[in-house]
């Protein structure tokens, strides 16, 4: 049985004040590995080492930091299939999703490496005569990241590698359900010969590791992906030390399908957005708002496709829907369905589960009286909602406290370009899925979906602060004092 030690300040060590936990496969409950978790002593060791190591790292030339990150990416790419198998075993990711996640993570690491050379500054056209005025970007210092279980490797990397690229040191607390994904990051950084002390991976409970990182004044920023409830708690605690924070939280993402859309293409787009990775994606399409003229035809074709989705062993390359992260999530979805059906919704297919496997589920006639209209589901379920026209569709789209991603499917690009700015989400994708990513675009939401933006130069913005510098080269006459 594999046993993973803590990666503490660049060294693999046994835990002293934490525990050794069982990391289990959500598909069958089998033991994947034993994992050492951090306690108070390990957190303190990691913070002290990271604070001490950061100035030398920040002082390196950009190409020196870039070299370390590129070597880490090469190591990950060389072990792509092995790491994908770990993702399948630990998180229940289907084979297709796991392979894609590792490949995309390699791209993220290389994108972060490229940003090392792009961290810029600028000249200020100052109105003070005899003075040169300019600004620079500087690293924050020590940054901590708290990552989720759904895209555990990719979202760990998106935090860690951009943070390091900007010249910071970094402490990662991976999700308790997927600690090995954080350990993979540590293995890659070790292969890249990252200097000792700069990075620690600290699996462990949020109440011990997470709270300690959020509340410690030596940590200058928290970057978090997860639930809105936990993110709000982090913001509250971080405010006590005036700590910066970046929060990427929940979503109840709508796809609007207008009456002029290609229905077959709209179904394909919504099917992917709703059921890829069992719907356990913050951007998952969980509300499909369809104009009434095509509502019945769209629903019929969507139902046919959902019924044919293959659920089963995530190691099987043909599997589309694997297990949820744990069986508790199944019970939450059951309650959503029960409430919706009692208020007039129709359960077209699914609504059953065995262990952590939840059958692909489709509801129609969902309305604003139902909890599922507003609540994130985080499972293989989506709702079809009828709209009278495009303006009604927009109203239904915006009636939610979340605002992460949205889609608009139509052949009328003039109408699409008019509607997109009025859709209350951080990202709008016209004729594409709500599930979209880019290494250069600003990823993030509005409302209760979060604060800040990440990816590419926007991540560098999050991990640096600006400093204004002036140089006086002519005498200045001050007022008489």
PLM feature spans:
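Hydrophobic face of amphipathic alpha-helices that form TPR/SEL1-like repeat modules
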Residues: 1-27
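Conserved C-terminal structural/oligomerization subdomain of aldehyde/semialdehyde dehydrogenase
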Residues: 28-34, 219, 256, 310-311, ...
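Residue-level signal for inorganic ion chemistry
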Residues: 29, 65, 87, 109, ...
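Short, well-ordered beta-strand elements within core beta-sheets of diverse protein domains
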Residues: 31-38, 53-59, 145, 255-258, ...
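Glycine-rich loop-to-alpha-helix module at the N-terminal edge of alpha/beta enzyme cores
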Residues: 32-119, 130
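Structural signal for hydrophobic packing residues in well-ordered secondary-structure cores
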Residues: 54, 58, 73-80, 84, ...
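Rossmann-like NAD(P) dinucleotide-binding subdomain of oxidoreductase/dehydrogenase enzymes
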Residues: 121-265, 387
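ALDH superfamily catalytic-core signature
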Residues: 229-367, 396, 430, 478-479
């Amino acid at each position: 049985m594999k046993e993973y030690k803590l990666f503490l300040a660049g060294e693999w060590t046994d835990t002293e004040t934490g525990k050794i936990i069982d990391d289990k496969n959500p598909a069958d409950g089998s033991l994947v590995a034993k994992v050492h978790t951090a306690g108070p002593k390990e957190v303190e060791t990691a913070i002290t080492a990271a604070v001490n190591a950061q100035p030398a790292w920040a002082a390196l030339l950009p190409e020196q930091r870039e070299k370390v990150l590129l070597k880490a990416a090469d190591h990950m790419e060389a072990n792509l299939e092995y790491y994908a198998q770990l993702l399948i075993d630990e998180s229940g990711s289907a084979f297709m999703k796991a392979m894609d996640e590792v490949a995309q993570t390699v791209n993220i690491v290389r994108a972060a490496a490229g940003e090392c050379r792009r961290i810029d500054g600028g000249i200020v056209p100052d109105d003070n005569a005899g003075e040169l005025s300019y600004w620079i970007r500087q690293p924050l210092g020590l940054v901590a990241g708290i990552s989720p279980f759904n895209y555990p490797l990719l979202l760990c990397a998106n935090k860690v590698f951009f943070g390091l690229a900007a010249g910071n040191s970094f402490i990662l607390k991976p999700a308790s359900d997927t600690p090995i994904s954080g350990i993979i990051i540590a293995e890659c950084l070790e292969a890249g010969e990252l200097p000792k002390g700069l990075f620690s991976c600290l699996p462990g409970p949020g109440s011990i590791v997470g709270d300690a990182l959020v509340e410690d004044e030596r940590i200058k920023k928290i970057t978090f992906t997860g639930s809105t409830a936990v993110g709000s708690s982090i913001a509250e605690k971080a405010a006590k030390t005036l700590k910066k924070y970046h929060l990427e939280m929940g979503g109840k993402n709508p796809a609007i399908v207008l009456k002029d859309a290609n229905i077959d293409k709209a179904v394909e787009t919504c099917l992917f957005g709703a059921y890829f990775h069992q719907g356990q994606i913050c951007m998952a399409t969980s509300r499909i708002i369809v104009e009434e003229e095509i509502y019945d035809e769209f629903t019929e074709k969507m139902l046919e496709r959902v019924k044919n989705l293959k659920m089963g062993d995530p190691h099987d390359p043909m599997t589309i829907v694997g297990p949820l992260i744990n069986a508790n999530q199944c019970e939450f979805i059951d309650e959503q369905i029960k409430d919706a059906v009692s208020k007039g919704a129709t359960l077209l297919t699914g609504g059953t589960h065995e262990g952590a496997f939840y059958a692909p589920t489709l509801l129609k006639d969902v309305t604003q009286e139902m909890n599922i209209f507003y609540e994130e589901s985080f499972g293989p379920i989506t709702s079809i909602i009828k709209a009278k026209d495009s303006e009604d569709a927009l109203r239904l789209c915006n009636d939610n406290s979340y605002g992460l991603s949205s889609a608009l499917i139509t052949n009328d690009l003039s109408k699409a370009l008019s509607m997109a700015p009025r859709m209350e989400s951080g990202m709008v994708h016209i004729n594409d899925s709500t599930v979209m990513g880019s290494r250069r675009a600003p990823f993030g939401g509005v409302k209760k979906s979060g604060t800040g933006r990440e990816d590419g130069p926007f991540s560098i913005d999050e991990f640096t602060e600006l400093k204004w510098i002036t140089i006086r080269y002519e005498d200045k006459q001050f007022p008489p004092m």
